[in-house]
């Protein structure tokens, strides 16, 4: 027999918590986010990024592509557009034709994130060829250490941009291998977007006093994605589309394409109520009542990602409050939208559902208000009393100090010198105008003469051609 105590819920100081460390994408460590409110009404609209239907999964996806050597980045992106039969594709930063490695290809809706990825940091593995042997093998390592931090760079001779001097930052570099006899060195570098590795190799050669150039280059990281993050080849993309077209098997296509949320995992997160999602998609600012959870360490004007409770990215926003403010404030703007990602009306509209808004809607339908919600001849008197037309409101009263009329000011008499100067200016203007008119007339006359000469030449040439043709015909008849 079991005792009665077995069925009693005992009070505990520790509540069981979900392990969210294995949750995907933006939902990872969801339980560690700070809670603003736990009360909201879930809406069945939308879906988790990994559970989208295949059409919307592809149109809001990104591919971490291993770019092959020889074709340009634009060619590769155009090929993917043709293979997947999508409307738009974009990439995360150009790679030279001979360069290989990470090229993030954004599809359709994900192209809205291209700008943020182009400005993100990059990592490269580079082979440098030195023109002469070094006296000491350690010299190359020392030179690499010197070439870190902010550096002046001018684009190479053959480049797509204007060759202006610019400052680019190399954050870190590491020598992997060096063969002094062959003059070949392999090094890794982490740098700012827009750094020219070719120029860096030339500078290395100059610093060592032997000269050098870039032999080979591979990008191993671009923004949020590296070689280890599901890197795929063009053949994989082609095969995946072929398998889907012929067998309707989505698994291969889902494997090579990742949701756009995978690019945003580095941003601070702000979780939005389902009822506020569509208003943010229409460009509204996120206010405190629409906030559910937020991350630690948000500072004023930081870039944050606004997300739903299902883990979908709504928009990239600019924080208008820090984490400390979000904890203490009960009203105000949380974030302004910088770039909207989600399509409008994915979630239903939840504004205009209050009693006054509903009444106004009904009155518009009955013809008691015009289509803009303004008063007309059918509007009831009780509504007119409370209605305020902002266009017809009286202007604010003018302060008494400004009501005093200013003293009338008589026009100042000009001196004789000023009058003469004015006359000279008028004469100069009239002379300039006359000269301009004469010039225009002369140009028109010249054009007309040229045209006439041209026409005469054409007529003469045609007459000569006709006469030569007639002579040929006569000769042929005689023969």
From Swiss-Prot:
GO-annotated biological processes: box H/ACA sno(s)RNA 3'-end processing; mRNA pseudouridine synthesis; rRNA pseudouridine synthesis; snoRNA guided rRNA pseudouridine synthesis; snRNA pseudouridine synthesis
Q: Does the keyword Zinc apply?
A: no
Question: Which InterPro entries did the record assign?
Answer: Dyskerin-like, PsdUridine_synth_cat_dom_sf, PsdUridine_synth_N, PUA, PUA-like_sf, PUA_sf, tRNA_PsdUridine_synth_B_fam, TruB_C
Kindly list the GO CC terms recorded for this protein: box H/ACA snoRNP complex; microtubule
Q: Give every PUA domain span.
A: 267-342
Q: Where is the composition biased (Basic residues)?
A: 435-460
**What Enzyme Commission number(s) does the record list for this chain?**
5.4.99.-
Composition-biased stretches (Basic and acidic residues): 363-374, 382-391, 461-470
- The catalytic residues are 96
Region of interest called Disordered, as start-end residue ranges on this chain: 358-479
CDD domains noted in UniProt: PseudoU_synth_hDyskerin, PUA_Cbf5
The record's keywords, sorted A to Z, are: DNA-binding, Isomerase, Microtubule, Nucleus, Repeat, Ribonucleoprotein, Ribosome biogenesis, RNA-binding, rRNA processing
Family as reported in the entry's similarity comment: Belongs to the pseudouridine synthase TruB family.
Subunit and partners: Component of the small nucleolar ribonucleoprotein particles containing H/ACA-type snoRNAs (H/ACA snoRNPs).
| Purpose of the protein | Catalytic subunit of H/ACA small nucleolar ribonucleoprotein (H/ACA snoRNP) complex, which catalyzes pseudouridylation of rRNA. This involves the isomerization of uridine such that the ribose is subsequently attached to C5, instead of the normal N1. Pseudouridine ('psi') residues may serve to stabilize the conformation of rRNAs and play a central role in ribosomal RNA processing. The H/ACA snoRNP complex also mediates pseudouridylation of other types of RNAs. Catalyzes pseudouridylation at position 93 in U2 snRNA.
Question: Per its record, how is this protein called by name?
Answer: H/ACA ribonucleoprotein complex subunit CBF5
Q: Which organism is it from?
A: Candida albicans (strain SC5314 / ATCC MYA-2876)
């Amino acid at each position: 027999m079991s005792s009665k105590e077995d069925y009693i819920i005992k009070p505990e100081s520790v509540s069981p918590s979900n392990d969210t460390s294995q949750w995907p994408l933006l939902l990872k460590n969801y339980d560690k986010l700070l809670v603003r409110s736990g009360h909201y009404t879930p809406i069945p609209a939308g879906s988790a990024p990994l559970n989208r239907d295949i059409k919307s999964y592809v149109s809001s996806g990104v591919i971490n592509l291993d770019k092959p050597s020889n074709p340009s980045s634009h060619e590769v992106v155009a090929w993917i557009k043709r293979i997947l039969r999508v409307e738009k594709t974009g990439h995360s930063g150009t790679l030279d034709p001979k360069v290989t490695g990470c090229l993030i290809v954004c599809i359709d809706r994900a192209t809205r994130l291209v700008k943020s990825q182009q400005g993100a940091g990059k990592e490269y593995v580079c082979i440098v060829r030195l023109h002469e042997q070094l006296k000491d093998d350690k010299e190359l390592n020392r030179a690499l250490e010197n070439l870190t931090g902010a550096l002046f760079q001018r684009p190479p001779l053959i480049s797509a941009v204007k060759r202006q001097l610019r400052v680019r930052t190399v954050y870190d570099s590491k020598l992997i291998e060096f063969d002094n006899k062959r003059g070949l060195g392999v090094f890794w570098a982490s740098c700012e977007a827009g750094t020219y590795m070719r120029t860096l190799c030339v500078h290395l050669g100059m610093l060592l006093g032997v000269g050098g150039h870039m032999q080979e280059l591979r990008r191993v990281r671009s923004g949020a994605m590296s070689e280890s993050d599901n890197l795929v080849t063009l053949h994989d993309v082609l095969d995946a589309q072929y398998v889907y077209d012929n067998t309707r098997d989505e698994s291969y296509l889902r494997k090579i394409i990742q949701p756009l949320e995978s690019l945003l995992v580095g941003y601070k997160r702000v979780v939005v109520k389902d009822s506020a999602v569509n208003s943010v998609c229409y460009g509204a600012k996120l206010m405190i009542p629409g906030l559910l959870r937020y991350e630690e360490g948000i500072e004023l004007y930081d870039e944050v990602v606004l997300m739903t409770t299902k883990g979908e990215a709504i928009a990239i926003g600019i924080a208008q409050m820090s984490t400390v403010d979000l904890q203490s404030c009960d009203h105000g703007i949380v974030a302004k939208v910088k770039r909207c990602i989600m399509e409008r009306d994915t979630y239903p509209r939840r504004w205009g559902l209050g009693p006054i808004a509903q009444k106004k809607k009904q009155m518009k339908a009955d013809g008691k208000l015009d289509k803009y919600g303004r008063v007309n001849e059918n509007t009831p008197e009780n509504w007119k009393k409370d209605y305020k037309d902002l266009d017809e409101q009286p202007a604010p009263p003018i302060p008494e100090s400004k009501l005093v009329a200013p003293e009338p000011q008589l026009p100042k008499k000009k001196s004789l010198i000023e009058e003469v100067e004015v006359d000279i200016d008028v004469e100069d203007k009239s002379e300039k105008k006359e000269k301009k008119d004469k010039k225009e007339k002369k140009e028109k006359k010249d054009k007309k003469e040229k045209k006439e000469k041209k026409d005469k030449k054409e007529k003469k040439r045609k007459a000569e051609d006709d006469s030569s043709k007639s002579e040929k015909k006569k000769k042929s008849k005689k023969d």
